[in-house]
């Protein structure tokens, strides 16, 4: 495929920007639609080349289209990532200062949690801790709905975790801000919000990474220390269709207690 950008690339980029993040099957359909609409030769196996052309043109703007895997469903996603504004300031045009502060504190609750979730009650209680303008509980509830709609958070059964878009766009921020506590998957080396931890050495694995790594192994052992893996191996089909359950993301009891104590101390010192 030629390295020159054309109308099909431009339309593809506009659609991706308007969605913020798109699942792989939708991106493949968009690729075909853009090529056919602008009468550009379409090849179903050339999506990576198509995106590569865009990325070469986006590079001087410090932007790139990245591919990631959703922790909730194990599916592939594409998102446009700004390499300069790789922290929460990129949200400043959409949210007020106190709303951004609430989002930062919500992220911290999720990242420091044992299972990658924060309850709605714990987030509502943050309204009284804001250093900027205080918020009413009703305002926090409405703001959480906005974060979910804009694909910064995922809400389920009164609990919240980070959306794939948030993890992809703010990965560098998470690594830099929480470098001592942020979990990094031992298999894919990406930030792991929901994960399983080794009972012995404490290394984390994404659920889908654990499922792939241990697939077909009768006696799974930790990829780092070779000790027996203490968790139920995630069913990749179940993760993809339903998302992970809390039992899948929970660590062993002893590790959980140590992490909980560390998290409490960290929050107290902040």
Curated annotation (Swiss-Prot):
Q: Region labeled Disordered — which residues?
A: 236-270
The protein's matches in Pfam families, at most eight in alphabetical order, are given as: SMC_Nse1, zf-RING-like
Q: What EC number is given for this enzyme?
A: 2.3.2.27
Any one GO MF term held by the record is:
zinc ion binding
Give the GO biological process terms: DNA damage response; double-strand break repair via homologous recombination
| Nucleus among keywords | yes
Principal localisation? nucleus
> Where is it found, in Gene Ontology cellular component terms?
chromosome, telomeric region; nucleus; Smc5-Smc6 complex
This enzyme catalyses: S-ubiquitinyl-[E2 ubiquitin-conjugating enzyme]-L-cysteine + [acceptor protein]-L-lysine = [E2 ubiquitin-conjugating enzyme]-L-cysteine + N(6)-ubiquitinyl-[acceptor protein]-L-lysine
Subcellular localization(s) per the UniProt record: Nucleus; Chromosome, Telomere
State where the RING-type zinc fingers lie.
185-226
Q: Which InterPro entries match?
A: C1-like_sf (IPR046349), Nse1 (IPR011513), Nse1_RING_C4HC3-type (IPR014857), WH-like_DNA-bd_sf (IPR036388), Znf_RING/FYVE/PHD (IPR013083)
On the tree of life, the source organism's domain of life is Eukaryota
Give all cystine bridges in this chain: none
Q: Which UniProt keywords apply?
A: Chromosome, DNA damage, DNA recombination, DNA repair, Metal-binding, Nucleus, Telomere, Transferase, Ubl conjugation pathway, Zinc, Zinc-finger
Chain intervals with Polar residues compositional bias = 237-251, 259-270
SUPFAM superfamilies linked to this entry: Cysteine-rich domain
Q: How is the quaternary structure described?
A: Component of the SMC5-SMC6 complex.
Tell me, in a sentence or two, what this protein's role is.
RING-type zinc finger-containing E3 ubiquitin ligase that assembles with melanoma antigen protein (MAGE) to catalyze the direct transfer of ubiquitin from E2 ubiquitin-conjugating enzyme to a specific substrate. Within MAGE-RING ubiquitin ligase complex, MAGE stimulates and specifies ubiquitin ligase activity likely through recruitment and/or stabilization of the E2 ubiquitin-conjugating enzyme at the E3:substrate complex. Involved in maintenance of genome integrity, DNA damage response and DNA repair.
Q: Which family does it belong to?
A: Belongs to the NSE1 family.
Q: This chain belongs to which protein, by name?
A: Non-structural maintenance of chromosomes element 1 homolog
